[in-house]
């Protein structure tokens, strides 16, 4: 059993081709997991404001802005994580990777090939890496 917590690469971007095994990720941020890129900031009420029209205290209808459900977390978008590793498996061995929780819409690639994913947020899942 190997720990995969150290020496990951991360970028926040909306490009394509990040699953490529040949992608140069040398400029990406070096991180360890667990990692939550949203809490790195910057924070602003403008990032997640919503209009509230009912004032339950004064029993009137007002329009005003206040930070919504994320408390002004930074821009919502896509984050990409990469991990470089080698497996030297014997024919009778297998390998799998376990995720304790990824925010949502996770897609996992190994050597440029789609392995699997999870559409739900912060739920654990495991994937078999043996064929890859």
What would you call each of these model-derived segments?
Residues 1-61:
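Accessory carbohydrate-binding/adhesion or oligomerization-edge regions at the termini
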Residues 2-15, 36, 44, 71-132:
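Accessory beta-strand-rich segments of carbohydrate-active enzymes
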Residues 50-52, 66, 112:
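Charged interaction patches that mediate protein-protein contacts
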Residues 58-70:
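N-terminal glycine-rich cofactor-binding segment
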């Amino acid at each position: 059993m190997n720990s995969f917590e150290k020496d990951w690469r991360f970028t926040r971007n909306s490009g394509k081709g990040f699953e490529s095994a040949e992608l140069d990720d040398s400029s990406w941020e070096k991180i360890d997991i667990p990692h939550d890129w949203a809490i790195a900031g910057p924070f602003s009420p403008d990032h997640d404001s919503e209009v509230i029209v009912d004032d339950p205290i004064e029993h009137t209808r007002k329009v005003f802005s206040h930070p919504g459900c994320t408390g002004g977390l930074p821009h919502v978008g896509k984050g990409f994580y990469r991990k470089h590793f080698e497996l030297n498996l014997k024919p009778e061995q297998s390998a799998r990777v376990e995720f304790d929780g990824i925010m949502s819409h996770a897609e996992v690639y190994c050597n440029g090939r789609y392995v699997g994913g999870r559409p739900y947020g912060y739920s654990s899942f495991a994937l078999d890496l043996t064929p890859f």
